[in-house]
């Protein structure tokens, strides 16, 4: 049996950060634009932009910097705050996964009996 996976959601007074928002930031870093990141994740540009806006509000500072489109095309990239947010989230996720490893194995064994 495959090991159960732990999914991390962090509830802050300003809002919630979870795997979907972090995946969007990673896709923006990889794709170089909000619209391409949204397409890669199967979401509309509007939904992607709304999530970026929410992350900017949660962080209290821009996590994505976007340049307008046009003939030369636009683009987007993560700010230092955005890169830090992704790194912190992934580090917390890894620590939580390691801390829960034994209990997840016990849960899996209990559920397969």
Model-derived segments and spans:
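Alpha-helical linker/hinge and terminal dimerization helices associated
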Residues: 88-107
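Residue cluster at the C-terminal edge of the helix-turn-helix DNA-binding motif
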Residues: 57-62
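Basic, amphipathic "hinge/linker" alpha-helix immediately C-terminal to the N-terminal HTH DNA-binding motif
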Residues: 66-89
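Short, Lys/Arg-enriched N-terminal segment that forms or immediately precedes the first helix
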Residues: 1-13
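Short alpha-helical elements of helix-turn-helix
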Residues: 15-25, 46-49
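Short helix-boundary/capping micro-motifs
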Residues: 28-39
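Alpha-helical DNA-recognition elements
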Residues: 54
């Amino acid at each position: 049996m495959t090991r159960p996976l732990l999914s991390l959601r962090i509830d802050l007074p300003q809002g919630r950060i979870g795997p979907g928002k972090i995946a969007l930031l990673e896709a923006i870093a990889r794709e170089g634009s909000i619209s391409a990141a949204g397409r890669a994740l199967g979401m509309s540009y509007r939904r992607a932009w709304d999530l970026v806006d929410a992350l900017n509000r949660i962080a209290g500072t821009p996590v994505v910097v976007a340049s307008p489109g046009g003939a030369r095309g636009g683009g987007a990239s993560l700010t230092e705050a955005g890169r830090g947010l992704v790194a912190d989230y992934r580090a917390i996720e890894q620590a939580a996964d390691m801390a829960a490893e034994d209990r997840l194995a016990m849960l899996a064994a209990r559920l397969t009996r």
